[in-house]
Structures are given as structure tokens and as C-alpha cells.
């Protein structure tokens, strides 16, 4: 089965939980952007968090995550929606370091800690919610945990992980978000905290073949996990040749003529998916005529 996420409740509705397997989704991002291992881990963690946060939205609502920690990777930008679709990129995909002291990919060094995590939710009808917090670790799981507590006032635990093969392909990726509802009993909190200390890294559990449902059983085993919804997850970009053409038309006929005179063609790439669109001279002439009608 491919990538998917689950939404669930546990401990008689005191706890809301999300878990996702994103191995193929992160692999598609790696393939498109040709990211090196540390950059793959950083982008993959952000994509995984983004797709789970997207699952908290409704209808046509969308969400954008921007992570700018001042590190060599530059900015990470992720878009997601309520349908399990996510896309994203890093400014500098060719970043890699030796493993850190814990034997893991050094995401914190790549991302940096001197910056911000920003979340913008487009709730429709020009209604936007923006939350912003300083990065506290650069490892991203801790940073999203802090975001939920500080910006949305929801006590949460976020775990995201990516394992990368020696040939730069993605071996495993996934994550979880556990959130405490108002009035959660102290003994429930204690049991979850103890469980979180005992579990292996989430990427290792995914590598071992655990499903999102089984992840939640590991995290909330005695809490009576009740799955509410299962949703496929994938890397999907909304760019298209038509959208790029519209962007060229919006430049106006003079600007398009300038491109024809100087270049004789136009080429545009989408930041999010790295797809390249080519327009030859004849096509530019057509777009110029359309621009005159605007």
C-alpha cells in the first residue's frame, strides 16, 4: 500500500492523533529536486509535518509552512491541503554534512536555529491565520511541537523522520502528531510522556514496516485508539502549462516582445516541483496576441 495518514482519537477523546507514512511522497520530492541526504531529511520532515497539518484543515482550505533558520539549506517552503496533497522545496538542495553526535543526519546544522517557523492558513474568503515562532532546535519535530504550544495553544508532541539510502534515495519517512484536548487527565499525560521516551525513532518504525495505525498503537497503546479517517498522501503540484502561460500573458505584450527579440523563446521552472515549461517563438507570439486583449 502507498503513503497514507490516519486521524484518530484515544483515551476516550482526550487525545487527538495523526500518523503518516510518507516514504513515496518524500522520494518523489527527492527525485524532483535531486536533494542530497541532509537536505532530503530536512525537506522530508517538513513535508511530513505539512501533510499532517493539512489533514487538520477543512474543504478547500490550504496551508503554507516557511522555515528559515539561517542555515546553509536556506528556506524550506511547503504547501498542503485537506486532501492529503503536499508539495515543497528547499532553496539549496545540495547540502549534506557528516552524521551528528547521535549518528543521525545533521538537519539542525543544515536548517539553522537563528530564524523562524511560519505557518499561514488560507481559510477562504480572504480569511488568513498566521502563526510564527522562533526555531528552538532546527530538528523540526521539536520546532513544530513548540509551534502548536505557543501559536495554537495546543499541547502537542510532533515526531517526524526520514531515512536516506547511500545512493540518496529515500528508505523510509513518516511522522506523528499527538495533541491533548482541554481537560486531559494528568495520568493520561504521564502515560503518553513515558511512552514517548521509550519508542524508537519514527523513521525506524516505518522502516520496520509499521503502518500509521501501528505507529499510533506504539504511541498510545493502552489508550484505546479509534481511527476516524484514513487518507492517501502524495506529492502533488498545482502548476501547469496553462498557469505559466497566464503568468507570461500578465507581463504584457511589450515585455513578451522583448523576450522574443532577446531570447526567441521562454523557459520557466516551478520552484515547488522543478517542472520546466518551454515556449517557442510561435507560442510566444500567440501569448503576445492574447496579452493585447487583456
UniProtKB/Swiss-Prot annotation:
Disulfide bonds join 237-239, 270-273. InterPro entries: Heat_shock_Hsp33, Heat_shock_Hsp33_C, Heat_shock_Hsp33_N. It holds the Pfam family HSP33. It comes from Geobacillus kaustophilus (strain HTA426). GO terms for cellular component: cytoplasm. This is 33 kDa chaperonin. Under oxidizing conditions two disulfide bonds are formed involving the reactive cysteines. Under reducing conditions zinc is bound to the reactive cysteines and the protein is inactive. Belongs to the HSP33 family. Gene3D superfamilies: Hsp33 domain, HSP33 redox switch-like. GO terms for biological process: protein refolding. Its main location: cytoplasm. It is found in: Cytoplasm. GO terms for molecular function: protein folding chaperone; unfolded protein binding. Redox regulated molecular chaperone. Protects both thermally unfolding and oxidatively damaged proteins from irreversible aggregation. Plays an important role in the bacterial defense system toward oxidative stress. Keywords: Chaperone, Cytoplasm, Disulfide bond, Redox-active center, Zinc.
Amino acid at each position: 500500500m502507498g503513503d497514507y495518514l490516519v486521524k484518530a482519537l484515544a483515551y476516550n477523546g482526550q487525545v487527538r492523533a495523526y500518523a503518516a507514512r510518507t516514504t513515496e511522497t518524500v522520494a518523489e520530492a527527492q527525485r524532483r529536486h535531486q536533494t542530497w541526504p541532509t537536505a532530503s531529511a530536512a525537506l522530508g520532515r517538513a513535508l511530513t509535518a505539512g501533510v499532517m497539518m493539512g489533514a487538520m484543515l477543512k474543504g478547500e482550505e490550504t496551508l503554507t509552512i516557511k522555515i528559515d533558520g539561517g542555515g546553509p539549506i536556506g528556506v524550506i517552503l511547503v504547501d498542503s491541503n485537506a486532501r492529503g496533497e503536499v508539495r515543497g522545496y528547499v532553496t539549496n538542495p545540495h547540502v549534506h554534512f557528516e552524521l551528528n553526535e547521535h549518528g543521525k543526519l545533521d538537519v539542525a546544522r543544515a536548517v539553522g536555529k537563528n530564524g523562524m517557523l511560519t505557518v499561514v492558513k488560507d481559510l477562504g474568503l480572504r480569511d488568513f491565520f498566521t502563526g510564527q515562532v522562533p526555531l528552538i532546535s532546527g530538528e523540526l519535530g521539536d520546532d513544530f511541537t513548540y509551534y502548536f504550544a505557543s501559536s495554537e495553544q495546543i499541547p502537542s508532541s510532533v515526531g517526524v523522520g526520514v531515512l536516506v539510502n547511500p545512493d540518496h534515495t529515500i528508505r523510509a519517512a513518516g511522522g506523528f502528531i499527538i495533541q491533548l484536548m482541554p481537560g486531559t487527565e494528568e495520568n493520561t499525560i504521564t502515560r503518553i510522556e513515558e511512552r514517548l521516551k521509550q519508542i524508537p525513532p519514527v523513521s525506524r518504525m516505518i522502516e520496520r514496516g509499521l503502518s500509521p495505525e501501528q505507529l499510533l498503537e506504539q504511541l498510545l497503546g493502552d489508550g484505546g485508539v479509534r481511527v476516524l479517517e484514513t487518507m492517501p498522501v502524495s506529492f502533488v503540484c498545482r502548476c501547469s502549462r496553462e498557469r505559466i502561460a497566464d503568468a507570461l500573458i500578465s507581463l504584457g505584450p511589450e515585455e513578451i516582445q522583448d523576450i522574443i527579440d532577446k531570447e526567441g523563446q521562454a523557459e520557466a521552472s516551478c520552484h515547488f516541483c522543478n517542472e520546466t515549461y518551454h515556449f517557442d517563438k510561435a507560442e510566444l507570439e500567440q501569448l503576445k496576441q492574447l496579452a493585447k486583449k487583456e
